[in-house]
Amino acid sequence: MNINAYDFDVIKLLVIKDWQIYQKQLASYVVGLLIGLTLVGMGKAWSFYVGALLLLVLLICAGVFAIQSSVLNERKEHTLPFVMSLPVTPMAFYWSKLLANVSIYLVPFTLVVAGTAFLVLFTPLPDGLLVWSLLIYGFLAMIYFVSLGAALVVESEGWNTFVMIALFTMVSPFIMGVGMIDAIGTNIKTNNIVWSPPAVGIFLAEFAVIALVIGVTSWIHRRKTSFL
């Protein structure tokens, strides 16, 4: 990683700075997600669909807002001269942005995943929803990492916006497509938690894409000798 002890201290300070900027917005997203989980757990058809939609929308918005606040807006506001004045290498700055964004996103993401698992396992909701839900959340995490990776290496705001829109328009087709796979869809309304080969394959593919994004973006920044 080519990062020394001093870089770790700088990374920590930059991560804390991003957290301080985002904490109020993060709190509002957490409140909204708790409302969504409450609606899902009410056990009524209308509240389930409204709550599920709210969870998806807020989870997407939380990720997009984090990327725009800590990466795209800083670039748009021409903070590069300030960054160059800091005693930080391009690699350390990359890791600070990656860790800040991932740690921020993990708060709403973990809340939704844990909350969904609890509701599925301990309420009358069919247990078969668990695998389907985890695959959807894994897909959301995957496209978040791809969007973040693009923001970290592509300077054009237009291209970053295009990437985000293109990725998030794939959410609905993915949800429907996964549900149409027999090994997955046939268990959704049952109490059977089945990790079928297609489900495991999709889950592993999502993690592979995330690992690939981190590997490629870190390699690109490792080759940089300056911010220019």
Language-model features, listed with the residues they occupy:
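Polytopic alpha-helical membrane proteins, predominantly small-molecule transporters/carriers
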Residues: 79-84
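Hydrophobic alpha-helical transmembrane segments of membrane proteins
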Residues: 1-78, 92-228
